[in-house]
Amino acid sequence: MAQMSKYNQSIILKWAYVTLLLSLQVLLTSCAVARERPLQEPHTSAVQGLLDLTALPKGEITKLDGEWAFYWNHLYTPGELMTARPRAYVSVPSAWNAYTLGEEKLASYGSATYELQVLVPNDGRVWALDVPVVFTAYRIWVNQVEAASSGTVGQSAQSAVPAKYPQVVYLPGTGQTSLHIVIQVSNYENYRGGLWQSIQLGDATSITVSQQFRIIGEAFLIGVMGIMAFYHFGIYILRRKEPAPLYFGGYCLLIALRSAMVGDVLIMRIYPGLSWEALIRSEYFCVIGSLWFFNSFLYRLYPQDGSRRFKSLLTWVCSAFGLFIMAGSIQLVTEALLFLQLFILFTALYMCAVFIRAVSRRREGALAAVAGAMVLGAAIMNDVLYLRGLVHTGNFTTLGLFVFIFAQSYLLSSGFAKAFSSSEELAGKLIHLNASLEEKVRQRTRALEQVNKANVIHRRFIGRNVILA
């Protein structure tokens, strides 16, 4: 049995390494493909500010990717664009600080106008745009009519007000044969500006259903992680000698809060007045806090496989990052994101080493932990590349965390279940011992009674012999 268990662990470890290598290969391949060609096929990509979607089937949603007309450091309205000439055509989605106009490398901070002409089928469809987060403020016109905005667009940091609010924009009227889309964008806060995520176009029903499915999925994941957090807080309250549930509960809670600040930014639907700066600081702080909580949880699980020095180092680094996030200027905070991402990757590698060591030493529940860690590691690597603009896959950390949290919950539950089973076994042995002890006492009592009776008979016999003598 021991040999079979060792063989199974060896097989799972090999598959773990293979899965990790395959994940790396897929991510690197995606990165290379993203650099070599646009996300969409040529016939559905914009060329020099024109996108032909006249053959778009009903019910289908498409991305408005390709070459948009681009006016750097100019905020033009649709009327002003009639006489303006585009300085360049740029690839969307991409942060504008990745663009080079002539010999000028564009800065992170500034303003610009994007323009795209879209040819659509004249079949009576009501159109809608699915606009993701744009850093950090925008205004949208469609066919000369202002359709939506987020924050306040300005040509200086003093006049601009940032916001983080993705939304669905329903376009008025039916029967259009073309959509003239103009988007003003300004950014004076984030290290990346512009349209660095894809805007999607489709009929209103399809766009609405797509958004609702995303919101339901995100809300479900946030709810599950929140429930897991308070469940483990409850376990800690009942048994305070073991802090592992407290650490894991804190980790789940911070991840749930961060998940509400990314994607469709569900927290803005609850607190619409939350400022962009507070949102970004809170998001980064949740990342740092969750990293510390999970490392503390991991050290409690496998103290013999982890490093106490690394735990102390991580505490100091997380504290320094946390203070910097709360007190530093927002521009410096966002520009330091790369260092934060590198630190997260370094910590993730350390945690993987701890998990692998725990598996090789056949620690309890380490296999499930490694499986969850691999999924999370692949998701984090994808998101780091996505945030750097190297791939266009989307955010997967929340989903990876969902799988990972369930693996860790299984690990904790397994530990408590085994502790409970051991307690029951000990209780059963104690009951059996008490029962056997009582039986031994009864047997001893009967033996003593028999001895006493024998002694009484013996004394009587001796006394009778003495009298006769």
Map each language-model feature to its residues:
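Extended carbohydrate-recognition surfaces in non-catalytic/accessory domains of CAZymes
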Residues: C31-G124
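Aromatic-lined ligand-binding clefts that engage carbohydrates, nucleic acids, or primary amines
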Residues: V118-N143, I181-I183
